[in-house]
UniProtKB/Swiss-Prot annotation:
Any one GO molecular-function label of the UniProt entry: glutamine-tRNA ligase activity
Function: Glutamine--tRNA ligase. Plays a critical role in brain development.
Lineage: Eukaryota, Metazoa, Chordata, Craniata, Vertebrata
Modification Phosphoserine, positions: 70, 495
Subunit and interaction comment: Monomer. Part of a multisubunit complex that groups tRNA ligases for Arg (RARS1), Asp (DARS1), Gln (QARS1), Ile (IARS1), Leu (LARS1), Lys (KARS1), Met (MARS1) the bifunctional ligase for Glu and Pro (EPRS1) and the auxiliary subunits AIMP1/p43, AIMP2/p38 and EEF1E1/p18. Interacts with RARS1. Part of a complex composed of RARS1, QARS1 and AIMP1.
Name of the protein in question: Glutamine--tRNA ligase
Family to which the UniProt record says this protein belongs: Belongs to the class-I aminoacyl-tRNA synthetase family.
Amino acid sequence: MATPDSLALFTGLGLSENKARETLKNAALSTQLREAATQAQQTLGSTIDKATGTLLYGLASRLRDTRRLSFLVGYIANKKIHTELQLSAALEYVRSHPLDPIDTKDFEQECGVGVVVTPEQIEEAVEATINRHRPQLLVERYRFSMGLLMGEARAALRWADGKMIKNEVDMQVLHLLGPKMEADLEKKPKVAKARLEETDRKTAKDVVENGEVAGQTLSLMEQLRGEALKFHKPGENYKTPGYVTTPHTMDLLKQHLEITGGQVRTRFPPEPNGILHIGHAKAINFNFGYAKANNGICFLRFDDTNPEKEEAKFFTAIYDMVTWLGYTPYKVTYASDYFDQLYAWAVELIRRGQAYVCHQRGEELKGHNPLPSPWRDRPIEESLLLFEAMRKGKFAEGEATLRMKLVMEDGKMDPVAYRVKYTPHHRTGDKWCIYPTYDYTHCLCDSIEHITHSLCTKEFQARRSSYFWLCNALDVYCPVQWEYGRLNLHYAVVSKRKILQLVAAGAVRDWDDPRLFTLTALRRRGFPPEAINNFCARVGVTVAQTTMEPHLLEACVRDVLNDTAPRAMAVLEPLQVVITNFPAPKPLDIRVPNFPADETKGFHQVPFASTVFIERTDFKEESEPGYKRLAWGQPVGLRHTGYVIELQHVVRGSSGCVECLEVTCRRADAGEKPKAFIHWVSQPLVCEIRLYERLFQHKNPEDPVEVPGGFLSDLNPASLQVIKGALVDCSVALAKPFDKFQFERLGYFSVDPDSHQGQVVFNRTVTLKEDPGKV
């Protein structure tokens, strides 16, 4: 019999011509639907009714395991599956039972095959449901949620036809309440809802000091919204699209559940060859956060398989950053913990004919279409002997590798599993001269630790096939790898290589230079870990790569520091002010609230003497429209003192520059209120203040179109300003590195580790308000 025209075949199933043409554009779907329709015609003849056609289309578009197509089409064609509800149950059943053979008796029971629900049963179930809600129905009448009645009746009669249930509900409600009256047609008042929404908005966003709005801090599960909520349950790995099953899968999953007790297990697996950056913060939050949200555990596993690039300081710094962000690893492990097991598995892989020793050089393997290895089909015994020779150091670096026999998604053929490296390892010393690659190590370490959800950034998607293949080739437990989009920031570079170039060029001091977006740099600048976590939460977890503006991160920083950084006063460009009629023979102690908006958080004292210092920019000899601070004829208040000062005399130096102001003071409540109150210091400490701006001038400094000269040509010459002679009040005298303050009217500042006795150094973390020019 000739194969009918596909368009005619699809329209014969009840699809519109447009829908049929659209389906034909999808090769996989059209192939599957064609097979389903052709098989159904063998049972039903050339004419297929629309209801059956709809089920066949639903099957073809939703079935992931094509091995089950013929089995399910048979049930549809023979009218054993005749409702959408049954089809959904059937699809869920085959997804949950990936291995042959299918228990047909169990399958039919779970899918309602042969179950007949009579009109009388529907009538009785609906009547029982209505009786349960009768009092409320009589009060609310047609405003009552009919969906609730439908849902309860459906639950009582799982395989009943939905339309029949709805018709019965409508009929019995009409019989109980009678026809709708005018009052039933009125919409429910929305006053309560509007008030609730207003309350929610006030709860979510509080107006805070300096006119800013504090953003809502997202909960852990809100952070894990989107794709992450579709994750499989532990032990149900096979329900994940694309997961590869073997005859051993279900037994291995059973053993896995016995070991883990159904516990969620994740891991954060950094390479110890550099410092973590803001993108890693998302990975840390996702891995640790997902485990925590599900009462699970998260490993910190160092992928230490590149001994020549690893340094002890990176291990320490990575652990410090994970704990600084507020997470405690269940266990700290190393890929090197498993070197013996990994080697034994490599030998087993060769024995199974799935790996071979190759002598192609690294340069021969590069490019899009490298030549196939002439050693791919060498005898197993020969590869075993050569691999042992590699382990014993009988090959020079680059002379031999162990390669796996598979083709990856990106077309890369036979990835390398082991290579020769004559570099002592920081943990194993000179025990090994062969080291496993990421492609070989990653999935097997996940398997050893019984990771349930292996969460990776999107660039590792091309390695998913090798992940599943390797675990299955060795018949070991196979976790699920799930990829999500990286988090990037504009005006930043985070590549280890490029940061080293910045350091070498003198553009930054080191990995922790506050202008960088490494986590050590952000900590040094004064970014609280809670702010970084909140930022990651707001970004969320999606498959798409995300590039964010730095000002969004800075907004999260302000939200946290506004509530946690006590206030102090500092003057960047000091101008001396002498109060000629100071009201006391000695300095007064001024009580200043640590947090003006919440005085329950305590106070600190600062001295107020006859000589104070104000910002030079807070004085102008001639006032101008809009200017409210100190000028001739325009007094100004001194914050927290209760006093107002008025200019009497300007003292100039030999160059004509203003050196000192002589003023008189009065109580603020003894006359007209001044237009402004300014900050000041008296008997202050001298300090160094470092003001930071963006390191790069363009959004995408690595883009050759935007920055043709390369990222080093895009440096902002004004990214750092050092003020040596700044003054700060004595309340910060005992501050330690990383202590944070809000300097009133100036911004948030953090004590730098460069501070020493007698010289405090402050880094400006962020300004008080976002600079509109930065958006």
